[in-house]
Amino acid sequence: MMAAQPTIREVLFNPVFQNNPIGLQILGICSALAVTSNLKTATVMAIALTLVTGFSNLFISMIRRQIPSSIRMIVQMVIIASLVIVVDQVLKAYAYSLSKQLSVFVGLIITNCIVMGRAEAFAMANPPLVSFFDGIGNGLGYSAMLLVLGFVRELFGAGKLYGISVLPTVNDGGWYQPNGLLLLPPSAFFLIGLIIWALRTWKKDQVEAPTYKMAPQVSSKEAY
């Protein structure tokens, strides 16, 4: 008996909270650390990855029955790389300064675990329309995490949002002393940890079963 096909609503909204690519699957961490020092770069990266994931899923699903199993990963990489090149060229043409800030991380979307994972695990086994929305949904889940990180890091690290002053800083005669630590990549790692803790506190079903049990404490005499 074939399993029921997931609905568009499920694949679009489940990755945001229920099965978040970063929060639950722990994928796409590297770019999340690097591009979230401000909301502008976080937003552009989020849009870029969402579009690439959605359209790569769509195109791969459309030709999934014609792809030989032995070269399916190569075909997936070619499609994803082509889409990433288009995104990169558009950024260089219309938002060159942002393209410079994002540096190599747009190009590294090609090897992003979220994009590759959805292409292999979902698009190769499902129809084009639902595959497209699965890609968009996972992109939205990734985007939500990036925007939260970018919001916290830019607001409390520089007192700004999208480059606009929100908290008047001491250097400008205001009251807020920016926390420069939040602008460093390691701070994003700790923030991601806090978000994961909050998600798993809220949704108990996301808590993983322990892989081992601590041995009971024994006295030194019993140990020997």
From Swiss-Prot:
It holds the Pfam family Rnf-Nqr. GO terms for biological process: sodium ion transport. InterPro entries: NqrD, NqrDE/RnfAE. Its EC number is 7.2.1.1. Keywords: Cell inner membrane, Cell membrane, Ion transport, Membrane, NAD, Sodium, Sodium transport, Translocase, Transmembrane, Transmembrane helix, Transport, Ubiquinone. GO terms for cellular component: plasma membrane. The chain crosses the membrane at residues 43-63, 67-87, 104-124, 132-152, 179-199. The keyword Transport applies. It catalyses: a ubiquinone + n Na(+)(in) + NADH + H(+) = a ubiquinol + n Na(+)(out) + NAD(+). It is a multi-pass membrane protein. One of its GO terms (molecular function) is oxidoreductase activity, acting on NAD(P)H, quinone or similar compound as acceptor. It is found in: Cell inner membrane. Composed of six subunits; NqrA, NqrB, NqrC, NqrD, NqrE and NqrF. Belongs to the NqrDE/RnfAE family. NQR complex catalyzes the reduction of ubiquinone-1 to ubiquinol by two successive reactions, coupled with the transport of Na(+) ions from the cytoplasm to the periplasm. NqrA to NqrE are probably involved in the second step, the conversion of ubisemiquinone to ubiquinol. This is Na(+)-translocating NADH-quinone reductase subunit D. The gene is nqrD.
